Amino acid sequence: MGVTKKPDLNDPVLRAKLAKGMGHNYYGEPAWPNDLLYIFPVVILGTIACNVGLAVLEPSMIGEPADPFATPLEILPEWYFFPVFQILRTVPNKLLGVLLMVSVPTGLLTVPFLENVNKFQNPFRRPVATTVFLIGTAVALWLGIGATLPIEKSLTLGLF
């Protein structure tokens, strides 16, 4: 290894190179050819191999044939719609239920404006956002679990 001297920022040649945009920090490995030719194909082929392996080892079984004349007792949506379904099911006025559904993303959009400390990403330094997240998660779980129960026990989850 040779001896490297510290760059002199008063050197006109170096200042001209820096003015042109040269002198950026080049840390790590270049993306071409290391990532694009070697790492990405390995990841893509590994993902394909996992999918094929799961399809061969655990094929999805075909269930019983659909009967268009037999309706289930209670029709439930997919699991990720359970909280919204519970809101629509328990609120007597459907317009109010739709307004409650619209208020959720609207409320989430207002959280950054409530707490004007955007320079902090640590959740312990953003108590309002952390509290809104925790309460929202608890309410979503409560509504989601309640949607799987009969309407009489849905809000109390059968606990009270």
UniProtKB/Swiss-Prot annotation:
It comes from the Eukaryota. It is found in: Plastid, Chloroplast thylakoid membrane. Keywords: Chloroplast, Electron transport, Membrane, Photosynthesis, Plastid, Thylakoid, Transmembrane, Transmembrane helix, Transport. HAMAP family: Cytb6_f_subIV. The keyword Cell wall biogenesis/degradation does not apply. This is Cytochrome b6-f complex subunit 4. The 4 large subunits of the cytochrome b6-f complex are cytochrome b6, subunit IV (17 kDa polypeptide, petD), cytochrome f and the Rieske protein, while the 4 small subunits are petG, petL, petM and petN. The complex functions as a dimer. Belongs to the cytochrome b family. PetD subfamily. The chain crosses the membrane at residues 36-56, 95-115, 131-151. The keyword Calcium does not apply. GO terms for cellular component: chloroplast thylakoid membrane; plastid. Its main location: plastid. GO terms for biological process: photosynthetic electron transport chain. One of its GO terms (molecular function) is electron transporter, transferring electrons within cytochrome b6/f complex of photosystem II activity. A longer mRNA that is not produced by splicing has been shown to be transcribed in barley and maize; it can also be predicted for rice. It is not known if this mRNA is translated. InterPro entries: Cyt_b/b6_C (IPR005798), Cyt_b/b6_C_sf (IPR036150), Cyt_b6/f_cplx_suIV (IPR005870), Cytochrome_b_C_euk/bac (IPR048260). Component of the cytochrome b6-f complex, which mediates electron transfer between photosystem II (PSII) and photosystem I (PSI), cyclic electron flow around PSI, and state transitions. It is a multi-pass membrane protein. PANTHER family: CYTOCHROME B (PTHR19271:SF40). The lineage of its organism: Eukaryota, Viridiplantae, Streptophyta, Embryophyta, Tracheophyta.
